[in-house]
């Protein structure tokens, strides 16, 4: 099995920690004035979803995680599972609510998602970075009401709620950044 040393660490690297695949969110090399250098990392366990801060002594090796990222198209959802299909082989994968997590509110039919597989089953789903959704409910923007933050909540077609500018009306299609859940622009 492949392994990585602390010099290979970078955000997005997947490795095994305590028998569970993990991904590095951020890392920093630290050389204190006294003592041995180390790498300070923030990792997310891919199965449990826990975020941990872990320090590794410089030169420490970790085992590479045997995970695979696939670009799959979202097909449909039933009572318990979300189904994704490989665009070339038409092979279907089913992911449970734990694997889909927060991505549920950004999933559109035929949206290309990154599905992470471990031992052949999906453990996480990453939606596209940007999605275009219709506003189904929002308060009317009052003319001249610009004293506040200049935003209002809007419910989108998938059920997600985001803050939008006052000029956005019901029925308009907007572009949303799924990583931060923020409004980006109006779609013409």
Curated annotation (Swiss-Prot):
May be beta-lysylated on the epsilon-amino group of Lys-34 by the combined action of EpmA and EpmB, and then hydroxylated on the C5 position of the same residue by EpmC (if this protein is present). Lysylation is critical for the stimulatory effect of EF-P on peptide-bond formation. The lysylation moiety may extend toward the peptidyltransferase center and stabilize the terminal 3-CCA end of the tRNA. Hydroxylation of the C5 position on Lys-34 may allow additional potential stabilizing hydrogen-bond interactions with the P-tRNA. The modification N6-(3,6-diaminohexanoyl)-5-hydroxylysine is found at residue 34. It comes from the Bacteria. It comes from Actinobacillus succinogenes (strain ATCC 55618 / DSM 22257 / CCUG 43843 / 130Z). InterPro entries: Elong-fact-P_C (IPR015365), NA-bd_OB-fold (IPR012340), Rib_uL2_dom2 (IPR014722), Transl_elong_fac_P/YeiP (IPR020599), Transl_elong_KOW-like (IPR013185), Transl_elong_P/YeiP_cen (IPR001059), Transl_elong_P/YeiP_CS (IPR013852), Transl_elongation_fac_P (IPR011768). One of its GO terms (molecular function) is translation elongation factor activity. Pathway: Protein biosynthesis; polypeptide chain elongation. PROSITE patterns: EFP. The lineage of its organism: Bacteria, Pseudomonadati, Pseudomonadota, Gammaproteobacteria, Pasteurellales. GO terms for cellular component: cytoplasm. Its main location: cytoplasm. It is found in: Cytoplasm. Belongs to the elongation factor P family. Gene3D superfamilies: 2.30.30.30, Nucleic acid-binding proteins. GO terms for biological process: peptide biosynthetic process. Keywords: Cytoplasm, Elongation factor, Hydroxylation, Protein biosynthesis. The keyword Protein biosynthesis applies. Involved in peptide bond synthesis. Alleviates ribosome stalling that occurs when 3 or more consecutive Pro residues or the sequence PPG is present in a protein, possibly by augmenting the peptidyl transferase activity of the ribosome. Modification of Lys-34 is required for alleviation. This is Elongation factor P. The keyword Protein biosynthesis applies.
